[in-house]
Amino acid sequence: MPVDMVDVAGLVPGAHEGLGMGNQFLDDLRQADVLVHVIDVAGSTNDKGEPIEPLTHDPANDIRFLEFEMDMWYLSIINKGWERFARQVQQEKSKISVSIAKQLSGLRVTEVMVEESITKLKLDSENITTWSESDVSRLATELRRQTKPMIIAANKADIPGADKNYERINQQFPN
């Protein structure tokens, strides 16, 4: 099976708001089926990618950072006109999963993914207008997990002490 690998631009805090190369980075991710997130498991680079003393940076923060930026990106797409969208779905008695999948088709979200997410999160599948901001945020996170599964590649694992970070990351991010 052929695989296309693409190295995408760096990410900075606030990328989902368009800061740095954020929009370019997120647009590059739009077509990805899987992400391979290469982290410095030895914690020898800081948030800016600058070399620092090994084991002084928590590589789990790098994982959380990428997940957060992607979750906020998904949420911003869902939230565009959400109230009007939710009312329209209710008034037209449209199937919620079909409507949301259509809105997020550019992210490769399918109707089945939306249905599974709604069920998993125990959201009201009949009345979208009852969903809270937290419900919509949880949906964004779940859809991101389904459409952009992430493999963590532990770089610099040969540096003494990196094995402890590796074990901790495996516990914190089991999937």
Label the model's feature ranges.
Residues 43-44, 73, 159-160:
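Short, acidic Gly/Pro/Ser/Thr-rich loop/turn segments
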